[in-house]
Amino acid sequence: MIKHIVSPFRTNFVGISKSVLSRMIHHKVTIIGSGPAAHTAAIYLARAEMKPTLYEGMMANGIAAGGQLTTTTDIENFPGFPESLSGSELMERMRKQSAKFGTNIITETVSKVDLSSKPFRLWTEFNEDAEPVTTDAIILATGASAKRMHLPGEETYWQQGISACAVCDGAVPIFRNKPLAVIGGGDSACEEAEFLTKYASKVYILVRKDHFRASVIMQRRIEKNPNIIVLFNTVALEAKGDGKLLNMLRIKNTKSNVENDLEVNGLFYAIGHSPATDIVKGQVDEEETGYIKTVPGSSLTSVPGFFAAGDVQDSRYRQAVTSAGSGCIAALDAERYLSAQE
């Protein structure tokens, strides 16, 4: 169970009003997020004696503290763990390591950030009318959530046959030598389908329209792969199974309106992700896709002192290990920035 960890200086103000206490809170560096990027940044900054504060949120981005990784049942590709472990277990270990080195972890959700002046200001959920907390630097590591279809049966079989990451989950035993399906019409869908052919008996790609949005080169690769079957003008209607694992997908041809049951043991969504950037919207440069724009090879953004790490700025890889590396980069960038301000 995740506990609320508060640094000692936050417990010595008994009797002081909430508004006065709020005015007194200033952090040298603040990390917003609770996934691999956030905790890796916290570990590096804490070991460098930068006294980081990490706001892990209550239900940030619709996910409990720990981020998207907590929805993954088995992780087999994170270095150092030859025996697979769950996403929740991995994040609990990272959290303990952050706390061990002195990170001030606060289980509150940051709901508003003001980057217009220094120090930066932030407010937490249910405290928007209070005096803001101030901070000299911010690392935003709020991640991105996979877009879901919300099909009937989806909640029952989420991570029990339904996933939004083929690279993360495609190799697990329940998918090996089984028919699988991918929903999407872009490059991501084609890439995931091609990846899944390493493990599946065959892979269906369900495309809503009568053509791909994918690049020509990706389309050619799909056409040449004998283990991939493309179903154009096709939508999914319902996920079915035995109550434990997915084994069927109800589909419909949008031209003929004919419905059928498609036998599949895995369904992968490849319809995009939504980066959690609402709290800084309009204050920092973003890519056209909504991801925070960073200087290549760094976590630097258009606002000095404001850094972005993990999936909130990575629209391509979105892996736990790449997020962790990004968190390390952000910590080093923030440390250099703060040292230069002294």
From Swiss-Prot:
One of its GO terms (biological process) is cell redox homeostasis. PROSITE patterns: PYRIDINE_REDOX_2. Its cofactor is FAD. It is found in: Mitochondrion. Binds 1 FAD per subunit. Its EC number is 1.8.1.9. FAD binds at residues 34-37, 56-68, 77, 110, 168, 311-320. Gene3D superfamilies: FAD/NAD(P)-binding domain. GO terms for molecular function: thioredoxin-disulfide reductase (NADPH) activity. Disulfide bonds join 165-168. Keywords: Disulfide bond, FAD, Flavoprotein, Mitochondrion, NADP, Oxidoreductase, Redox-active center, Transit peptide. Its main location: mitochondrion. It catalyses: [thioredoxin]-dithiol + NADP(+) = [thioredoxin]-disulfide + NADPH + H(+). GO terms for cellular component: cytosol; mitochondrion. Residues 1-23 form a transit peptide. Homodimer. Present with 414 molecules/cell in log phase SD medium. Acts on mitochondrial thioredoxin 3. Implicated in the defense against oxidative stress. Belongs to the class-II pyridine nucleotide-disulfide oxidoreductase family. This is Thioredoxin reductase 2, mitochondrial. It comes from Saccharomyces cerevisiae (strain ATCC 204508 / S288c) (Baker's yeast).
